[in-house]
């Protein structure tokens, strides 16, 4: 068992190192009183301990020991008149791990406690190999992302999906979508955006990666305008780029570099990316409005999306989530809800783009509902720059 005291730093900061050392000794004493003759406790480092069970104990035994220790510590806290209130988190690994070598054992020990602490205070986690493999894969992907960015964004690619005017059925623009692949033992693997984009955000690598995608998309917009003069490009922006970077400056630089009209570069964000009008977000929105850059709410209809969001964010248009669209096409109840949202949104001068259009019948229904723009596999799947130019430079033919 790998044991860690939760928020021990706060005890040291508020009461001093002397009292902190007293807590360390007391916690060790409390735990020792809970152990059998076949169990040993060792102080590992700082606020961490290791309990070794020399018997073939089960997971249930580990849970029981954890509860016993927790009760003992709770009594200690009461006896100390609540001078320090704390808990412990415990990660449990099988003793067989010791046979795998010191380094592997250390890694799994650290992983188990980290997982326990990620559950909140008083966490308890029993090592699971599948969880560990996910953890290792996450580390490999992060390392590969860093290396790719350093090496001129090798592995990153921009895919484009057409956006079509609902009434004329003519292509008016595209959404730029970040894609990433990495070399593995089996060959090149395309990593799902659902997997690598959160890692980019978590590490802050979304700032340089997002800047690269933005410039590639702006260059593509400039290229497409040779064939479709009013072509517009939609780019996605993360809350991390707003909080930690200077994405509004990046957007303005891209517009200037490729001599684009501001209204031709649309900025998309999902509602979950909004930050309750923090100073950084307000500055970002004001910069877009001041320079005439359209702002788009993506994936509307998911989570707790509401019309207050549209009112407060004042977007140029909203994109109805593809799952919401599919439900509306297959359920009368959802269809009525979908249909009635459209005039409400239009009433405040906000346009609507329906995502996830996959069939001609869906196109016709959207036209009846007076949706403004359409996007989905019916018009084309996301594809690379070369293929997109070949397919759409001369427009799009919808029957």
Residue map of PLM features:
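Conserved helix-loop-beta segment at the catalytic/binding core of cyclic-nucleotide signaling proteins
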Residues: 28-59, 293-297, 350, 360
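A short glycine-enriched loop-to-beta-strand structural element that forms part of the catalytic core
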Residues: 43-52, 80-115, 122-128, 230-238
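EAL-family c-di-GMP phosphodiesterase catalytic domain
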Residues: 53, 183-186, 238-245, 264-279, ...
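Catalytic-core segments of nucleotide cyclases and related cyclic-nucleotide turnover enzymes
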Residues: 63-67, 80, 95-121, 139-142, ...
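C-di-GMP signaling machinery
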Residues: 96, 112-157, 167, 199-206, ...
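Active-site core of bacterial EAL-family cyclic-dinucleotide phosphodiesterase domains
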Residues: 137-199, 236, 297, 354, ...
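Catalytic core of bacterial c-di-GMP phosphodiesterases, primarily the EAL and HD-GYP domains
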Residues: 168-173, 203-280, 356
């Amino acid at each position: 068992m790998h044991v860690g005291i939760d928020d021990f730093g706060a005890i040291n900061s508020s009461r001093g190192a002397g009292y902190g050392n007293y807590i360390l000794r007391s916690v060790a004493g409390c735990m020792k009183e809970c152990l059998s003759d076949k169990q040993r406790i060792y102080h590992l480092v700082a606020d961490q301990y290791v309990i070794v069970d020399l018997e073939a104990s089960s997971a249930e035994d580990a849970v029981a020991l954890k509860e016993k220790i927790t009760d003992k510590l709770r009594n200690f806290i009461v006896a100390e008149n609540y001078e320090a209130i704390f808990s412990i988190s415990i990660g449990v690994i099988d003793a067989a791990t010791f046979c795998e070598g010191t380094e592997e054992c250390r890694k799994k020990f650290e992983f188990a406690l980290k997982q326990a602490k990620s559950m909140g205070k008083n966490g308890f986690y029993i090592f699971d190999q599948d969880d560990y493999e996910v953890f290792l894969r996450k580390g490999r992907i992060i390392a590969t992302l860093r290396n790719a960015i350093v090496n001129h964004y090798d592995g990153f690619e921009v895919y484009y999906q057409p956006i079509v005017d609902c009434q004329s059925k003519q292509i008016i623009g595209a959404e730029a979508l970040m894609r990433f692949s990495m070399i593995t033992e089996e060959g090149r693997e395309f990593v799902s955006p659902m997997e690598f984009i959160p890692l980019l955000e978590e590490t802050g690598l979304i700032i340089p990666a997002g800047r690269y995608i933005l410039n590639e998309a702006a260059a593509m917009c400039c290229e497409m305008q040779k064939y479709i003069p009013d072509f517009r490009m939609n780019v996605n922006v993360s809350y991390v780029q707003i909080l930690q970077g200077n994405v509004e400056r990046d957007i303005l630089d891209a517009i200037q570099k490729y001599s684009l009209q501001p209204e031709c570069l649309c900025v998309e964000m999902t509602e979950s990316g909004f930050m309750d009008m923090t100073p950084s977000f307000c500055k970002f929105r004001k910069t877009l409005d001041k320079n005439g850059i359209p702002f788009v709410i993506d994936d509307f209809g998911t989570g707790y999306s509401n019309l207050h969001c549209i009112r407060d964010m004042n977007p140029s248009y909203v994109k109805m989530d593809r799952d919401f669209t599919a439900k509306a096409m297959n359920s009368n109840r959802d269809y009525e809800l979908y249909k009635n949202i459209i005039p409400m949104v239009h009433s405040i001068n906000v346009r609507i783009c329906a995502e996830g259009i996959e069939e001609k019948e869906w196109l016709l229904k959207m036209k009846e509902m007076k949706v403004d723009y359409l996007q989905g596999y019916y018009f084309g799947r996301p594809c690379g720059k070369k293929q997109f130019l070949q397919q759409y430079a001369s427009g799009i033919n919808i029957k």
